[in-house]
Amino acid sequence: MNKITPMMQQYLEIKEKYPDALLLYRMGDFYEMFMDDAVTASGLLEIALTSRDRQSEVRIPMCGVPYHAAEGYIARLVSAGKKVAICDQVEDPRKAKGLVRREVTRVITPGLVLDAQNLAAKQPNYLAAVSNSTAGERFGLAFLDVSTAEFKMVEIESREALLEELIRVSPRELLLSDDDEHPWAEELPKLYGIALTPLGADRFDGKRAEEALVGHFRVHSLEGFGISGMDLGIRAAGAILAYMQANLLGSCDHITRLLPYSRGDFMIVDEAGVRNLEIFHSQSFQGRKGSLIDILDETKTAMGGRKLQQWLRYPLLDLARINNRREAIAELAANAPMRGETLGLLSRISDVERLNGRNSTGTSTPRDLVALKKSLQNLPALGAALAELTSPRLSELRARWDDLADVADIIERTLLDPPPPGLAAGGVISAGVSEELDHFVRLSRDAKGWMADYEVQQRRDTGISSLKVRYNKVFGYYIEISNANLNSVPEHYFRKQTLVNAERFITEELKTFETQVLQAEEKRLELEQQIFADLRARIAREAGRIQAAADRIADLDCVSALAEVACRYDYCRPVMDESDAIRIRDGRHPVIEHYLKDGTFVPNDLDMDQRDQQVLVITGPNMAGKSTILRQAALIVLMGHIGSFVPASEAHIGLVDRIFTRVGASDDLARGRSTFMVEMQETANILHHATPRSLIILDEIGRGTSTYDGLSIAWAVAEHLHDFQEKGIKTLFATHYHELTELARSRPRVRNFNVAIREWQQEILFFHKLVQGGASRSYGIQVARLAGLPEEVTGRAREILQQLESGHAPFAAAPSGAARRGRPAREKEPGIQMSLFQRSPEWLRDRILALDLDNMTPIAALQNLHALKEQIRGSAGEEPASCASRGKR
């Protein structure tokens, strides 16, 4: 049986404490992984899997990554949803007696990332936790970005709403009690990249959670946080705190607030809406480019970019808060010099939030603190700029402005600028900070001069002109003499090393000097590390002030950026109120107009309310611009609710509580859902959750099934939205079912619109203008021709269309080319009935035969004749079931 080595025994003891993590074990210049960890990591990192003790009967799988490049590999493991424990050597190997002591110095999980290179600058990185009631129908959700100290909680009344909120928050990691079953969470890793981490049920205990929160915030109770009675939210927040403290292995004093919120305070745009409106991700560009945030984000700081994203995820429903933002944007938009100065100063500021987070958790470097200092040095000028502004939001920012000059000053006086990347080599602390340190620095610095003088002296004393005095980290200080001069070596020289062409020696004098210098160097490094640790602690005590300042910087950055966008693209300041109106003049799509040549985007007006124009049925061919008009209306409403100016010449927007979209059609293979099932589930979600305050965007309903079924469903959905709670719901309904225009006859608040086109010399001209009335034709063949279908296909399609429009079934065309050889030509072949409402003739015969002409007055006969004529001409009349059944065949 193989004996376990001391090193492997140490590894196993440490690994036992972190069974759910990949343990990176420092050995010299590498981090090594063993056993199952090695197998997992080698696959994820695409590195070689080897083995330890190859001569042994039992080989131990092993892989490793270079120490200097470890962060990149760690980032890949964490991105794959893995928990990583970093085990470092915590004593100098040269001083170790036996095995070098090692300890886990940090644990990194998907939701607990602090290193800047492992984080997207303008994206939050949330760790979330969910607790549930005994019945499992009420939930508490808490989430924390440890890198920025953002800590929030909410209580939710249904499983469906919980999933909706989780998708909106988009955490990287979700903590769940291992005592409960969570079938609703099973698809989260696959569909949304959320890593699930089971946690002991005791971590979700209400009393334990409250004690943990009270202890962390150093308060007597949680009443001041406004979370009294939110037991489920407190349990979730307590679980996050316990998990963070167990894994970060450091202080988290920068987390100073826990903010509760209510879903009812914000507009909800569900997952389909976020995707279809391309708020954060463009389907065309497959990334941020081409999305709404890509157009709006002119922020200059990382924390400003994150706050703008938060505004878009949580649009406001409070008019006072909306107006507060909008007035600040208006003031900056009207003052170009001030806006330019503000944006210029903001561009010099680093990510203060995350620098503060790293410092508070004890992971900041000298470069981090110098970056913090340089950022804070811009705050006095920003504060002076704010003094000239008068809008309520900006005046409040100025009143609470903190220059943090004392923090910047202490860093300035303590650290050299620029500093080295780390502390290992020293050279970090400024002269004058410590007399003792200055003494050791002089000793280290003067060593080179002493060596040069000593070399001159030894050459003179020995007569060896080629004698050299040198130093390296392995052998220390030495005298090197070539083999040709060995006969001249004095007796007080002691041989230290033999080379091919020379010998290296040491003297008592050189040995004494070496001891003094090395001790001085060691003392210098120890002192520098202690002074830096003291500086870290001093700055950490100001974490709350720094966090508050970062939040104000982000706020100023957001309103300045939106003011810049408003001026650059000629946006207007919308009127926002509690009415049910949406009135837009010259509305534009903010993204599409950006990518079109100047002046080529066609603006459109839109008028909606719940009294006159509530359901707008929009018809017209593909490529006419229906989808653009629908999406731009939703985006303008959304932008109004974050306080932004909007792309229009005028806009009046009544508060909207939800925006729903049903756009496009595609399979959802990941969930095993067909195109039609996806369409119907999205439509069902709209019908179940929309309110009279909602805005609904429907871009085709019923395309994924047969024409009859599709039209029937679309018709019923439109009726339901019109009639809902007698008020109805504001709806933009684009469709190719021209039959839906008949709804305007039976529903008073349905209005027909079409996107104007003209046909000229068999070409179709798109005007992209929304006009009243339904479209008379779909122009599908012309669009197909523009798409490049062969002329023989589009020509044949025109023939068939003419036959259908004349009420005749199409006849098969004679085959051409090889298909015709050996077959007798037939002038025409029988077709099938294809018109949607075309009836078989039996119903007309039956109706005429049923007339009692002998007992009918002339007037009654005319009335019956007129009724038959209308039924023949009409397309929406209802026939007997037997006739309809035959018509479908």
Curated annotation (Swiss-Prot):
In terms of SUPFAM superfamilies, this protein maps to: DNA repair protein MutS, domain I, DNA repair protein MutS, domain II, DNA repair protein MutS, domain III, P-loop containing nucleoside triphosphate hydrolases
Gene3D superfamilies named among the record's database cross-references: 1.10.1420.10, DNA repair protein MutS, domain I, MutS, connector domain, P-loop containing nucleotide triphosphate hydrolases
- Pfam families from the UniProt entry: MutS_I (PF01624), MutS_II (PF05188), MutS_III (PF05192), MutS_IV (PF05190), MutS_V (PF00488)
Q: Which InterPro entries match?
A: DNA_mismatch_repair_MutS (IPR005748), DNA_mismatch_repair_MutS-lik_N (IPR007695), DNA_mismatch_repair_MutS/MSH (IPR017261), DNA_mismatch_repair_MutS_C (IPR000432), DNA_mismatch_repair_MutS_clamp (IPR007861), DNA_mismatch_repair_MutS_core (IPR007696), DNA_mismatch_repair_MutS_N (IPR016151), DNA_mismatch_repair_MutS_sf (IPR036187)
Q: Which domain of life is it from?
A: Bacteria
Q: Name one GO biological process term.
A: mismatch repair
List the keywords (alphabetical). ATP-binding, DNA damage, DNA repair, DNA-binding, Nucleotide-binding
Q: Does the keyword DNA-binding apply?
A: yes
Record-listed ATP binding positions: G620, P621, N622, M623, A624, G625, K626, S627
Query: What protein family does this chain belong to?
Result: Belongs to the DNA mismatch repair MutS family.
Q: What does this protein do?
A: This protein is involved in the repair of mismatches in DNA. It is possible that it carries out the mismatch recognition step. This protein has a weak ATPase activity.
What is the designated name of this protein?
Answer: DNA mismatch repair protein MutS
Task: Please name the source species.
Answer: Syntrophobacter fumaroxidans (strain DSM 10017 / MPOB)
Gene transcribed to yield this protein: mutS
